[in-house]
Amino acid sequence: MSGLLIAAPASGSGKTTVTLGLMRALKRRGVAIAPGKAGPDYIDPAFHAAATGEPCFNYDPWAMRPELLLANASHVASGGRTLIVEAMMGLHDGAADGSGTPADLAATLNLAVILVVDCARMSQSVAALVRGYADHRDDIRVVGVILNKVGSDRHEMMLRDALGKVRMPVFGVLRQDSALQLPERHLGLVQAGEHSALEGFIEAAAARVEAACDLDAIRLIATIFPQVPAAADAERLRPLGQRIAVARDIAFAFCYEHLLYGWRQGGAEISFFSPLADEGPDAAADAVYLPGGYPELHAGQLSAAARFRSGMHSAAERGARIFGECGGYMVLGEGLVAADGTRYDMLGLLPLVTSFAERRRHLGYRRVVPVDNAFFDGPMTAHEFHYATIVAEGAADRLFAVSDAAGEDLGQAGLRRGPVAGSFMHLIDVAGAA
């Protein structure tokens, strides 16, 4: 099992475009790709899946125990597949205490690191920058760079000359191209399912990467570098039930692949339904999962989805365990106020009203401990990222005691009423990550 980490000195360097192009270009050459994304991001993995035709797992070195990282990598990269993981932020960026960096992930999984460097505003300084990133730790290896946003032949010559003096291989040089940019929304890039020109974008990125990069050298590096260690399966989050109905469409797209895989490994059967298509959960399901997404963009449609609403209430009445995360939590509430102030009725299964008219960013890693064992039976790691505000809340049991990445107590969060529960936290792993 071979693997690469596509990293950068900072966000905005072009990692996603290069990664998508590289994945598709290698796939064209018959390389079996196992896509991955470092960190808790939901949006990039959907692009990776579109580029490769394979599900994309997240690898979060802060929120996941090393044994889970190794187990997931061993699973997806088996059978000769090449694991290509896109990093988050900069190579050495992590939580406030410096933990959970992409470099940590490279060290844990034995991934060769290729740096994508935005060269638009530098020339010879690139050598000092890259050498500093490469030498910062001795337990990882930066094997080369892909230079992005290069302005001219002369600019390229200066960059190559500087990097040659510090013996840093250049695997590719991409010229500036404003056409190859993905649109963004408040939680990051626009979702793959909403990007009508996505296939054309990926094909264009692949053509650029194939023309500008030494794919044979990149593939060779992935092959000869120390391999991703084989690993036995790890303890995983317990399934919500034996037959779990999962909401899946562009309003409920933020669902971790490793979570679904873990539930299946735990013996659960999973079915999918689309609230936006006015579908309810499988009537035989003993658990329902509403993941996060952008329900605020589809609040009117969800409010009017009679079969969805009826099916969810029927599930609650028969005692099925219903769990909503972030956007799913908001939909379980009584109402959702859109950015323009319009209120839409939601399911009314939990006593809260959320609003995007009073925006406030909530962002960070969390450790959560269940207040009782009705839904979950031990401490877990999670991530929170949303702009919604709770503007009304009724009586219900609290779900979690929450602390942040630094261990600061954030109080209790989330609600539970009978078989229905939810919170803004996206659950990632059982506790134990550093």
Curated annotation (Swiss-Prot):
Swiss-Prot/TrEMBL keywords: ATP-binding, Cobalamin biosynthesis, Glutamine amidotransferase, Ligase, Magnesium, Nucleotide-binding
EC numbers, comma separated: 6.3.5.9
Record's keyword annotation contains ATP-binding: yes
Active site (UniProt): 326
Enzyme type, top EC level: ligase
Cofactor: Mg(2+)
Record's function text: Catalyzes the ATP-dependent amidation of the two carboxylate groups at positions a and c of hydrogenobyrinate, using either L-glutamine or ammonia as the nitrogen source. To a much lesser extent, can also use cobyrinate as substrate in vitro, but the physiological substrate is indeed hydrogenobyrinate, as part of the aerobic pathway for cobalamin biosynthesis.
Leftover remarks: The a and c carboxylates of hydrogenobyrinate are likely activated for nucleophilic attack via formation of a phosphorylated intermediate by ATP. CobB catalyzes first the amidation of the c-carboxylate, and then that of the a-carboxylate.
Protein name: Hydrogenobyrinate a,c-diamide synthase
Organism the protein comes from: Sinorhizobium sp
Lineage of the species this protein comes from: Bacteria, Pseudomonadati, Pseudomonadota, Alphaproteobacteria, Hyphomicrobiales
